[in-house]
C-alpha cells in the first residue's frame, strides 16, 4: 500500500495561484486544492514509502517559491 500525506501549505501574499500551478507539476502530488482557514492550500502526496514522501516534501515542495510554511499530516 502506498504512503499518503496531506501537506497544509501557507503561501506568501499574492503567490497562491503560482504555488498551486507549480505543485501540480511535482511527481507524487496527486491533488492540490485552495482552501479557507489558516492554510491556503492542501496538497495530497502519495509515494511507495514514507521516506519517498519525506524526500518529495523536503526537496521539491519546500523549494517552491512563494511557500512560507508547511505542515505535513501522514495518513494512517
Region spans (language model):
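A compositional/biophysical signature of low hydrophobicity enriched in polar/charged and small residues
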Residues: 1-76
